[in-house]
Amino acid sequence: MPAKRAYGMDQDLYPWSPIVTRPVLRWPDNARVALAVIVNLEHWDWEVPANTPLAVSPLGGPEGLWTGNPPDNRFPDIGGYGNHEYGNRVGIFRILAALDKYGIRPTLALDKAVADHYPFLIKEGQKRDAEFIAHGLSRRRIIHIGMSEDEERQYIRASIEAVAKATGKRPTGWSGPDFQETLNTPNLLAAEGIRYVCDWGNDEQPYKMTPKTGELYSLGVHAYLDDNYIHLHGRRTINEVNLLWREWFEGLYADGANTGRMMVLHLHPWIIGQPWRIRHLDEVLGHVSSHAGVWKATGGEIIDWFKAQPVR
């Protein structure tokens, strides 16, 4: 049943729950921090259907050189296309090598276009026993409020089915392109068998959402700490990102002595997979891995553990 609106809430998608009022959360082996690394594998469309709302960062400005809206759609966005293609041709392999080095199984967010057209990347993930989650249709085609409920249902279903076909396993996690949802999205995801969603960056622990049917949990990604928003749009240098990610972990680790926290690191191969940036990811992962009490997990493993705990 949907949550009742109450103190602190202006929607009924999940209950109001201050972290200080919750039971203590313990991760496996009494770890302080659960670390998950989500890597977006995305395709930037050469062309998109007419009147398609295109991806624009919440911080302002398009991801490529052009917005795709008149008059800029008179020619393809080669800049945006090239950036994302670089990630799938080159950058992803640097990220996977760094994750291998520290024994981290990735959670790979696939959009439909990647699932359909990049079987080599699927195989690389399968070699590492990665978890694959659904990530919309493409980087430029996002969920938006102009969709009817049935249009959004078909969008979600097409994404899920593409990942299932490409990987041989139906995904149970969802990461919306550009973190975009409508008020229908959680209900539609749960109805399609999705168990967790990564769009709600409002907590440091998982929590149960309240769809009309099915069961859905939040594994929140803090958008302003992902490599795109903090580095490119946030105009932080890569050295600053390195420091901020370490300080993020240090804060979670300190608070995790009292109750478990999670660090969901959200990465884009075309950004952090560049040769002058990858060293900083390696250093951050090395710093996190040097601490006792860190549980390295996939998104699904974190949700499975959380679900098995006493009623929260």
Q: What do these predicted ranges mean?
A:
Residues 220-251:
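A conserved mid-domain beta-alpha-beta active-site/ligand-binding segment of alpha/beta enzyme cores
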